[in-house]
């Protein structure tokens, strides 16, 4: 707990978010801390000054490459946060406009990675090795398929205009950060624990559990409820795996490995057509909880965790599709 202050500054908020995410990392804190120790060892072994200067030192304490402070215009106490799923240049201009109307926004947060965090967000995919191993996939298979996916995503994001929105934040003199996996960890672990405790028998039971949560209720009002992408409501769920964190969707070939490990149902935010076709091939049921609603649940749980851990308060102004629920 940070004492003697009513509010957090940006760095304190950032580090609290990371610590809260490690608390609920599906791999477990021990594996994450070992990863950080290995990164520190690699950093200490670098003798080339140029390479050392290029090293992102946030990696020494932050295992989530898709979560970063993108711009600090003014290091101030964070009382009011303007947060959304995709807070890009348009939303940054909106933030500036709202401040002209005395909104007093101290920090803009985008959930999906942006800036230099987006340029290397594929590094987060590495956590899928341990995640899928814990779900019963042989470690050598999980590692090989995860490395294949990392390589593919790295190539796909390489040509993007990564710093477009970060530069806009700088020009508008706005504090700006992205929080991706730190939020996604929360929704995956929360739903995993919910399903473990309730032990749903059929797919209809899983849908009922999701539809009882406020974020999914609100999404349903906007015609985007949890849905079945494979299987019927009467299907028995079998072994259920919630897959909602790890940067991006796993490699399509991982579906065969999950089927071989006995997985009967996947609960996901979203899946590509190729993933869905592969699930059909191996008779894996798919419960699609919803992308933006699941992202929103993760953010809501994260903000709750930060407040509980730090004993500090902050106000949220939701935008860009973010379904804010004060949990």
Residue ranges and their predicted role:
Residues 1-327:
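Active-site catalytic microenvironments in core metabolic enzymes, especially phosphate/sugar-handling
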